[in-house]
Amino acid sequence: MAGISVLVLLGLLAACVVVVVLLLQFLARASLGVGGDDPLLREGLGQVRRRFGGCLVAALLIMIGGVVLNGLLPGWLGIPLTLAPGLAASVALLGFAVWPTAPQVGTGSTSASLIRRSAWSFGSRRLFAVPATVAAVYLGALATAAVVASPDDAGLMRAFAQTQGNLSSSATPFPGSFYGLPLAAMTIVVVVSAYAALRRMASSASILSSATEDLLRIDQQWRRIVTSIIVRISAAALLGYLGVTLVYAGSAMHRASDFTVNGGSATSWSAVGWVAAIAGLVSVLATAVLSGAAIAAVLSLRDQAVRPSGVPVGQSR
């Protein structure tokens, strides 16, 4: 198992570096706009803010329900609380995707653009790479945890055990398949929900009522703003899951390896546990930053009515 622990440690460090680099680029580039004011865009974004606000309230109620249900069902060993954040994020994203289109702003006449739009039309590759990379790293972490997990006293794969000679130790909870399978399924649900929200945003009717060149630019600007918010919400949910899972996994690894043989640590898994726990705490902190940025962006949507300087229509900064 020593060789496996070294591989896990190297993989964990490499994954952390990739995620941190992408996250820093994301935070540096995900500005919602620059200076100026446009009444039409301001009014349209106010309508979008109400959509997002309602979805975030629904997500908060889901979180509260998960906490309450977790207390009422202790025999479920934390599964309701484990799934609540992902379910809340998915409800917020899917709620935005299915919410009726906001009424148009303007003269009352309608128009349509012949430009074909997809879910990826209003963001850069680096923007979308953040949640995609976090999801891939998280699924890889869950798969690795499932391989090294051990059964607990009830036979559930939610423990981490170590044996050295006549000594043995185990610790729970550990994200083996008991937690890993539901978490992997929830990760896929969050990704699909984010895609649905992005596709809805890209394909929905304009919040403006005509298609002059100037209003077309405004329409594409609000779509870029909403894309940034959707990506922030999904990235925060996935990064939060990754962080909390690493903290619990690292804690279990360290506690199960916290005995000595001939004056030294029993296994190298103790070091892996420390690294995983620290990486998890950093991820949780980054989640708080992303979540705060997403909520602040929603609350200030009307103030994001901007005229981008020197940015061609259809391109992001």
Regions found by a protein language model. Give the residues of each.
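N-terminal membrane-targeting/anchoring modules of bacterial envelope and secretion proteins
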Residues: 1-152
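Membrane interfacial helix motifs at helix-loop boundaries and amphipathic/re-entrant anchors
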Residues: 1-12, 64-86, 144-184, 246-281
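Transmembrane alpha-helical segments in integral membrane proteins
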Residues: 14-29, 97-100, 181-209, 235-243, ...
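Juxtamembrane inter-helical linkers in multi-pass membrane proteins
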Residues: 35-38, 106-117, 200-223, 304-314
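Intrinsically disordered, low-complexity segments enriched in Gly and acidic/Ser/Thr residues
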Residues: 196-287
